[in-house]
Amino acid sequence: MTEAVNQSLTSDFTPSCVAETPLLMRLSPHRQGKRAVLFDHFMKRLIRHGTLHVRLPQGDLRSYGTGQGPVAGFSVRSHAALQRLGLNPALALGEAYMDGDVLPEDCTLHELLDLLTLNLMQGGAHPAEKALEWVRWTKRRLDQFNPAGRARRNVAHHYDLNARLYALFLDRDREYSCAYFQTGEENLEEAQAAKKRHIAAKLKLDRPGLGVLDIGCGWGGMALTLAREWGAQVTGITLSAEQLAVARARAEEAGLSRQVRFALMDYRDWRQPVDRIVSVGMFEHVGLHHYADFFRMIRRVLKPQGVALVHAIGRADGPGSTNPWLAKYIFPGGYSPALSEVLPAVEKAGLFVTDIEILRLHYAKTIAHWRARFAGNRDAIASLYDERFCRMFEFYLSGAELAFRRMGHMNWQLQLTREQNALPLTRDYIWQAERQSVIRALGVGGIHSQSPPSP
């Protein structure tokens, strides 16, 4: 079924097909020509590296760029899409791909987006994009107002999708966040297990029974790991009813329901003191206006000798705004902050920053694994939703990978304490704890070397 749909969508688009579209029948050749001129002007400014071939709705083939380097192409199947691409490409390209109005030609979607991203990063920004930037800057201040009610709706938009969807492209533990590649050769399961070990080591879980709060616990993978492998007493909180049901079922199945509990709760409502706090992939949904609330909450409930670890997506180029397509279709209210926007709130909360680690290309590798698994299970995913949904997710995953590979996005891990003496003076305890975790998993006793693992 999916193969037939794809074949029909990628067939040659002739002028006779265009004439059958009611909207286009109402357009004069003059108006169609103006739209083509606007689009042509945009593409000439954008493509300065490599070559891009574009087939216009009337069948004309245009080529842009240097004629050297990477090559990609796409067809535009309607003049309405052509106009939207000329006026607001950041939103229109994804929408046109979802609707079948833009189709890659002689390349994959990922290759097409890679060439476009390469040119955007080389200074080929659309003039309208620059003009709209101040509007987006203002709008993001409103979008980032994220009280409890809106936060629940925003989370439900993406995370309350059918649980089977995520099982079809994530790892077995359903870790929907950046993995940790120590060599770059790990498979997805190995890299996600390494991520959990790395975070657990930074939490310094040096004795069983420590109380841990997992803010934004997802499907429970981190909480269950901390309980099973480190003896922690964990409470995971989420705003997703779908994730909550899966996490509780997993705890019951693992025989850990007395050691791990999950609740549908906003982080602002938590009151009980805890020894450790972990938050992985949730901070992007907090909202700029609420950073102070978030870190004050950590300061309030963390015990004096406690440790907190926040793992989130960030940007290296300073404050910005969320891509409009991503904000509309994938993560409403979401924002990946620069550390310069985060650290002032940490300081005002009275917390010590004891460690900051930047994970640069780790998320690009993670999403590449997700893309491959999504493609391998595309028919099954289409049976859960439809072709348009699959196109939306393909566009999202390809764009996200390129943001981390080419556009300065990265992950950061921020370790925080209330007291200066809560942790050892050096970071040696981190690699030692990771090594001990690996040895336990292999069933080997004792540490045979005091050298840190290779980076």
Question: What are the roles of these predicted feature ranges?
Answer:
Residues T2-A193, H198, L205:
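Feature captures hydrophobic
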Residues A247-R248:
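Conserved SAM-binding loop
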